[in-house]
Each structure stands twice: as C-alpha cells, then as structure tokens.
Amino acid sequence: MEKIHDQNIFFLKELFEDQYFDWIYYKQPITFNFFRSGGGTHLYLIENANRKYVARINYYEPKNAWGVKKQEYDVLKFIEPLKISPKAYYFSNNNSIKQDLTIVEYIEGEILGDISDKHIFDLATDLNKLHKTYQFDRTGDTLPPQDSSPYRCTIYNEFANGEDKKIEKYLSWEDINKIIEPYNRINKKLGDWFNNLRIFDNLTKFCLCHADLKKENILTTDKGIMLIDWECAGSDIPETDIGRLFSGCEFSERQQDIFLKAYYGNIPDEIILQRIIFIKKVLDFFYILEDYIILKRKTWNPDKMLKELLGYEKQMDGRA
C-alpha cells in the first residue's frame, strides 16, 4: 500500500509542476502527504501558503467506470453558491496513474460525533436549501438527470445488489455460517416488502440529493455543518436523503421529530413520513453488515450481529 501512496504523491507533484493552477501560490512550498483512505478513495493533503486541499484518488477500480469522481466534481461546482460543501478545483479521468481523481477544498472540522439540537437544525437548514434550490422533473445520477419515467424508489436494490452486501463474500470470517441463513432470509423478506410498496407511485417532482448521508460525511465546523463526499449525489425524492440521514446518524425518535419540524415547518403528511421511515428501515438492515464487517464500526462478534439481525427481523415483521 505504501508503494501506491508514493506513486500517487509523485503523480501529484508532477501534476502541479506541469500545470498552472491559479488557486496555487507557486512562490511558496507545496507539500503532499497521505491523509487517509475509505470508500474506495485514497485522500492526500496538499498544503500551500496557509491553504489546504484534498486530492481524492480512486483505488477501487469499478469507481472509474461508474464515473463518480466526475459526478462529484460537477455537483460541487453546481452547488458552490450554497456554501454547504467543499469547493471543487480539479478533475481528471485521463492520467498516468489510470485512476479518476478530484482536488477539492480541505474543510477544517470534525466528523459529526454526539449530535446536538443545533446540529439537527443546521442539517435541516442545509438539506432544505439543497432540495429547494435544485429541482428536476427526472431522477438520475447525472446533471441534468436522465432517468426515464415512471419513478421507482430503487434504494433497496441499490444496496442489495452491491457486491459488498453479499454475505457470501465474507465466508472466511470466523463463525460467519451462523449469519448467512438469517441474513439472506431477512434480506429477501425486506426486498419483497419494500419493492411492492405503493407509497412511491406517481411521484413526478425530484431534487438534488446528497445520497450518502452518515456521520462520516458530515463535518462540524466553526461556520456550522458542512457535507462532504458527494460521489453518490443525484436527483431523487427528498425523503431518500432524510431516511439516509436518520439511519446513518442513528437519530432517536426525538431527534427525528426535531429535524422534521425544522425541515418541513411542522410534521409532514403521513405518506411522507412513511416514505422516510420505510427508507430508513431498509438502510438500518444493511448498516448492520457495515457495522460489523464492511466499515468495522463494531468489533466482530457473530453472536451479537445475529442478535441484532433477529431483533431487526422481529421489528420488521411487526411493521411491514
């Protein structure tokens, strides 16, 4: 891995020598250092004249084909006037390292930890601003969006079909066998239920959504909340963003109520609430896998994971 980082830093140094960027002060030193990795992206901190930038370079090969760095760059340019995200400075999908990359503003801040009421109000304000400012008559992950009608909420399929969400991928994990059957059983039951809901029928108004709202992508700063990692952004119904937020940040019912009143001005119609809660329900299931295996937020313990899965199934059977 160290060899890859050396290669990427060498590439960045050459890039800044070969090209002139008007946002760089070339009379001052430019330093490049590995920052961290995650989500198929290596991050490198670039420092120059008291300013900082982040180079975001793919390392998971399929991300190049998906075009997520181009989408992120386009979206960040598009929403720059809102001042809720980093500025985008550079994009490349044709280079010597054969990996798509962006260079964006480095935001001084901390990943969202304990969630205060002010954080919730700030999130509601930022998302309301995003959703109301950029509205579309189609969905899709390009700008402008190009998906055909009628609308279908594909959030279950998006997660269930992900390579990293297949439990068989983790057969080498100790005692994984006790997880496989219940995970697949609940997964199928969840898909059969969610994909036959009628509450998503006949929707024709959509908006720009972040589409990956979780604590890791939310920074608290001196100027308020900032949203980072916009690779998944696209046009969808706002309920998808809110459901992702509630699940990804593990909002309590009280915190959900505070957000809904701040975002909508009051508690919204029942059908809107159902869309949000049912989307959250889908994500809650897949986040169990993320917690124990993919992102390792929790220490691997198959018995505890099984207990969470069975508890989830019991709740789902009572609600579905």
Regions found by a protein language model. Name each.
Residues 4, 61-67, 297-303:
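Short, flexible/disordered intra-domain loops and linkers
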Residues 8-26, 132-211, 311-319:
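An alpha-helical support segment within catalytic cores of ATP-dependent transferases
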Residues 25-34:
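Conserved N-terminal boundary motif of the eukaryotic protein kinase catalytic domain
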Residues 33-150, 154:
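ATP-binding pocket architecture of kinase catalytic cores
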Residues 36-47, 54-55, 188-240:
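Active-site acidic catalytic loop and adjacent metal/ATP-binding pocket
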Residues 59-60, 101-114, 132, 161-170, ...:
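A glycine-centered beta->alpha junction motif in the catalytic cores
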Residues 60, 109, 225, 233-235, ...:
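Activation segment
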Residues 239-268, 281-300, 307-315:
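Active-site activation/catalytic loop segments of kinase-like enzymes and analogous catalytic loops
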